[in-house]
Amino acid sequence: MKEIVYGPVKSWRFGKSLGINLLGEIPRICTFSCIYCELGKEGIYENERRIFVPTDKIIHEFKKHLRENFEVITFSGAGEPTLARNIKEVSDRIREIKKDIPQVLLTNSTLLNMDEVIEDILSFNIIDCKLDAVRKTTFERINKPMKGITLENVINGIKKLRRSFKGILSLQIMVLPINIGEVKEISEIVKEINPDEVHLNTPTRPPWKKPVEKEKLIPLKELFYPLKVRTPYD
């Protein structure tokens, strides 16, 4: 992914979305190397926050899309967006230009234990946090975290965000054949967090070629009752 601003693209979770890539042209900059990542295997591990793309450049590219029709502005892109130290500055600048469009942050939750990260993202309208496992072995197998990133930190970080975030908090669980048997355990942690919405997803884009079938995914929604749950098959 080389575009700084891309789309709009249709999202089953959020509608027509204009994407913001804060991380630039490197194939992937992330604290994870998930086995289902659509960006592929290339990329670098990183957990130090810095500015990858100057704010003015991002805003310049954003303004080129102002005549397009989109329902949300989604901060995602080529890796983990909270690694970008200018995430709040970019968000604030975009809000000055497009006050009426909700801003969505997609995060893998690994940096939410940092106070400065929490402070930087509180103004988003929607934050969608990843939680694919609650067992250490499954976490390491699916998400392939860089050294020093632990499952405990991820879960505690999401709980920390929940306590201070006033917007809509959703949790995304990527359901795969290797973690489908763990979804009940995941649901118990999710209920403790008490998000506004749960997204039971399954990968449908390359390099992953075997999404969980509708007949297996839909019944899992019951495990999260009474929380609101959505799937790509709804």
Where do the model's predicted regions map?
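Canonical Radical SAM [4Fe-4S] cluster-binding loop centered on the CxxxCxxC motif
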Residues: 12-53
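Glycine-rich beta-strand-to-loop/alpha-helix junction loops that act as flexible
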Residues: 74-80, 108-109
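Conserved alpha-helical substructure of the radical SAM core
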Residues: 40-74, 89
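Flexible, glycine- and charge-enriched loops at secondary-structure boundaries
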Residues: 48-55, 147-151, 210-217
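Conserved AdoMet/S-adenosylmethionine-binding subsite of the radical SAM
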Residues: 83-212
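Auxiliary Fe-S-binding modules of radical SAM enzymes
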Residues: 1-13, 24, 59-60, 66, ...
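Structural motif
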Residues: 15-17, 34, 70, 126, ...
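Short, histidine-centered active-site or binding-site loop motifs used for metal coordination
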Residues: 24, 40-43, 76-79, 143, ...
